[in-house]
A protein has these predicted regions:
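N-terminal signal peptide c-region/cleavage motif recognized by signal peptidases
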Residues: 5-10
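Cysteine-nucleophile amide-bond enzymes
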Residues: 11-290
Length: 290
């Protein structure tokens, strides 16, 4: 049971909380550059100024989830073209921060570098313009950042926040003119956002939450706790809601396979392997192909 706790404890953007990253190998750096170049081409080819981008930072497939962490790739990010603005947990200060990360570095955060998955959601211009402007407004973006982090923050809780929750609330501020987190969550409820329901193996899992400083149960409804459920913000639930709200939004997934980089319109199913199927596009052929 404890083995189930570790991935969920870090699922919402902390990516193995406070472990020291090893230095990437030359091959891994080359892969990340190749992968990020393909993503950049997809975003620029659509005339985008912004894309929601998600990675498989941790393996959540046992809960029916492919992606664990999302941010906004911004064409005009002062940190560099298409750098990803995101919430991350600052281990040195013990607090969440906003972080602009280069696209290649974001790609390197994949759970399995040799077969990583990335998702892009390309929004229509009428949606992306307001979100792009707000994301680059440091004062307003920081105003939605809560100082207390929880990986399993309740989707409509105000006491804690995780990275994907901040992203949803940023969207509410951009499109619903919400001025604070409470207003943002009220607007999200009105617009049909419900987060993602994770069905846990059983109630004993909840007792183990006390072992992690990154998990909190205080705000989760009693009926969810009784049923061993957690309702939190994860990339898939956020992308599903955005596609319902903006039917013209385009979902594209890219993964690394032995054949090369594979692009799939509409995305991969959570349990799907990275294998070329009819309708897919091989973006970059691998030099390992025979």
């Amino acid at each position: 049971m404890l083995g189930l706790l570790a991935p969920l404890a870090s699922q919402a953007g902390t990516e193995l909380l406070c472990s020291r990253e090893r230095e990437a190998t030359v091959a891994e750096q080359a892969r990340a550059l190749r992968f990020s170049a393909a993503l950049r081409e997809l975003m620029e080819g659509g005339g985008q100024d912004l894309a929601l981008i998600a990675r498989d930072g941790l393996d959540l497939r046992r809960w029916g989830q492919r992606y664990s962490h999302a941010g906004l790739a911004l064409r005009d990010n002062p940190a560099g073209p298409w750098a990803v603005r995101q919430l991350y947990f600052d281990c040195d200060s013990g607090r969440p921060r906003l972080f602009d990360q280069g696209l290649a570095a974001f790609v390197r955060g994949s759970q399995r570098p040799e077969q990583g998955f990335m998702a892009l959601l390309l929004l229509p211009p009428e949606a992306s313009a307001a979100l792009h402007a707000l994301a680059l407004d440091n004062a307003r973006a920081l105003g939605l950042l809560h100082p207390d982090y929880s990986a399993n923050a309740y989707v409509f809780g105000l006491r804690y926040q995780n990275c994907n929750q901040w992203l949803a609330e940023l969207a509410a501020a951009a499109w619903g003119e919400a001025g604070d987190r409470a207003q943002a969550q009220a607007w999200l409820r009105e617009q049909g956002y419900a987060g993602t329901v994770l069905q846990l193996p059983g109630r004993p899992w909840l007792w183990l939450a006390a072992l992690s400083p990154w998990l909190h149960l205080a705000e989760h409804p009693d009926e969810d706790l009784a049923a061993a459920r957690q309702r939190i913000s994860l990339p898939q639930g956020l992308m599903d809601w955005l596609q319902q709200r903006f039917p013209s939004a385009r979902r594209v997934d890219v993964c690394e396979s032995p054949d090369g980089l594979i692009q799939r319109e509409g995305g991969f199913a959570p349990q799907a392997a990275c294998e070329l199927q009819p309708g897919d596009r091989l973006l970059v052929a691998s030099d390992r192909r025979g």
